[in-house]
């Protein structure tokens, strides 16, 4: 249900659900993640993958693939259970929907991670994504812009 309000000499049409959400919204819950913690989370996730796959491949190709699958399984478990990757959970970060300020749904999280993987295959675009996060005031990476997400501190 929408309603009309007057503010000064302007008429504003508001959606009641948006107004209820706005009044319940606490900005302190959505503080921006630091650039360093975002970078560190990426490095931790990459290091864990590198170690699991590297140890596996040291034992043979099949074991390397199993190591990568186990890593993906852990990440999927953390994303489904906690709404965070392992590193984001350890560092107190969470991915939110940029438009609703709500924690991102599992399916959207998976899509976001797939975008990151595709960018990683083209190292140049992954570097560009990091630079985008460095120069933007809201610290959103190219992945965030494409997926409609933002990484914030998890105040829970």
Swiss-Prot record:
Tell me which Pfam families the record gives. RDD (PF06271)
Listed under GO cellular component are:
plasma membrane
Q: Which domain of life is it from?
A: Bacteria
Query: Which keywords fit this entry according to its UniProt record?
Result: Cell membrane, Membrane, Transmembrane, Transmembrane helix
**Which residue ranges traverse the bilayer?**
46-66, 114-134
How does the UniProt record describe the way this protein sits in the membrane? Multi-pass membrane protein
Keyword NADP listed? The answer is: no
Compartments in which it is found: Cell membrane
InterPro entries for the chain: Pra-immunoreactive (IPR051791), RDD (IPR010432)
Q: Under what name is this protein listed?
A: Uncharacterized protein HI_1560
**Taxonomic source organism:** Haemophilus influenzae (strain ATCC 51907 / DSM 11121 / KW20 / Rd)
Q: What are the leading ranks of the lineage?
A: Bacteria, Pseudomonadati, Pseudomonadota, Gammaproteobacteria, Pasteurellales
């Amino acid at each position: 249900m929408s309603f009309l309000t007057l503010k000064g000499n302007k008429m504003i049409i508001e959606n009641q659900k948006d107004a209820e959400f706005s009044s319940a919204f606490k900005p302190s819950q959505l503080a921006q993640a630091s650039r360093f913690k975002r970078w560190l989370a990426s490095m931790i996730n990459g290091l864990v993958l590198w170690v699991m796959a590297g140890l596996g491949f040291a034992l043979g190709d099949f074991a390397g693939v199993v190591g990568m699958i186990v890593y993906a399984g852990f990440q999927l478990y953390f994303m489904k259970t906690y709404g965070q990757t392992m590193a984001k959970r350890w560092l107190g970060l969470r991915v939110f929907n940029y438009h609703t300020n709500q924690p991102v749904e599992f399916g959207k999280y998976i899509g976001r991670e797939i975008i990151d993987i595709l960018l990683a295959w083209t190292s140049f675009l992954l570097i560009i994504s990091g630079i985008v996060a460095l120069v933007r005031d809201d610290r959103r990476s190219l992945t965030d812009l494409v997926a409609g997400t933002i990484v914030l501190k998890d105040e829970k």
